[in-house]
Amino acid sequence: MKAVLQRVAEARVVVAGETVGQIGQGLLVLVCAERGDAEGQADKLLAKILKLRIFSDEAGKMNRSVQDLDGAGKQGGLLIVSQFTLAADVSGGNRPSFTDAAAPDEGRRLYDYFVAQALALHPMVQTGQFAADMQVHLVNDGPVTIPLHIDPAA
C-alpha cells in the first residue's frame, strides 16, 4: 500500500463543485492499494501515518505527530483521498501503466477499510470520494511531503 503525505495548513476536496471533505492543520493523505495488499498493509500504513513526527515543536524540530500538534494533545485533521495513480509504472515508456494498482473492487474495499480504521483511531477524519474526479485544494505547510510504502509481502 502506498501513500503520499502532505503536511498542510488546510486542505479540501471538491467533487462536482461541492466540497466533500475539508480540514485545517493536519495531513492530506493520498492513498493507493496495490495488487497483493490486504488489511495488514492498511493497518501498518495507518499506524505509521498517525505516529510519524513531521510537525514542528517549539524549537522548530519535527518532533510532533498529527495526534499531538502542540505537545498538549491538540490533534490535527486527516484528509484521506484515494489515488490509484500512485501505483503508476513509467519504466516502459512515456505512458504510465497502472497494472500494479489493486483491482477497482479490491481498491475500494481496502480504501474503505483504511478510512474506517482511521475513523476508529483518530477523531478528525475527512475523505474524498473513491473513483471520483476530484479537485484537491491545499496549502502545503513547509512544504513537507513524505512518500510511504508498505510492501504487499509485509
Curated annotation (Swiss-Prot):
Keywords: Cytoplasm, Hydrolase, RNA-binding, tRNA-binding. HAMAP family: Deacylase_Dtd. It holds the Pfam family Tyr_Deacylase. NCBIfam families: D-aminoacyl-tRNA deacylase. It is an enzyme of class 3 (hydrolase). It comes from Polaromonas sp. (strain JS666 / ATCC BAA-500). A motif (Gly-cisPro motif, important for rejection of L-amino acids) lies at residues 142-143. The keyword RNA-binding applies. Homodimer. It is found in: Cytoplasm. This is D-aminoacyl-tRNA deacylase.
